[in-house]
Amino acid sequence: MAKLSSVNKNERRKKLVKKYAGRYAKLKAIAADSSLDDGERLIARLKMAEIPRNGNPTRIRNRCELTGRPRAYYRKFRLCRVQLRDLANKGLIPGVVKSSW
């Protein structure tokens, strides 16, 4: 199990990202638009810098739903490899079968 503080910190980050998502996307589009003059783009970048660091979507870490483990994460199942293997062997994940050839 991952430390509860790490899992909670990631949850706080998710809330901040959701809070600033609209503003962040709008400013990012302005900053990337090459048809605008450099002054407007610079202002957009400076406003992006004022958004809290944890409001940036890249700061979110994918974690296992059951254990909170941050590594070896399978997006399709939202589980780490350890839990995926355990649940698949027990037959608790529909459609997942052990391969043999």
Curated annotation (Swiss-Prot):
Nucleotide-binding recorded as keyword: no
Cellular component GO terms held in the UniProt record: cytoplasm; small ribosomal subunit
SUPFAM superfamilies: Glucocorticoid receptor-like (DNA-binding domain) (SSF57716)
Signal peptide residue numbers: none
Gene Ontology molecular function: any one: rRNA binding
Keywords recorded for this protein, A-Z: Ribonucleoprotein, Ribosomal protein, RNA-binding, rRNA-binding
Pfam families: Ribosomal_S14
Domain of life: Bacteria
Biological process according to GO: translation
Job of this protein: Binds 16S rRNA, required for the assembly of 30S particles and may also be responsible for determining the conformation of the 16S rRNA at the A site.
Subunit record text: Part of the 30S ribosomal subunit. Contacts proteins S3 and S10.
Family: Belongs to the universal ribosomal protein uS14 family.
Protein name: Small ribosomal subunit protein uS14
Species of the source: Sphingopyxis alaskensis (strain DSM 13593 / LMG 18877 / RB2256) (Sphingomonas alaskensis)
Gene: rpsN
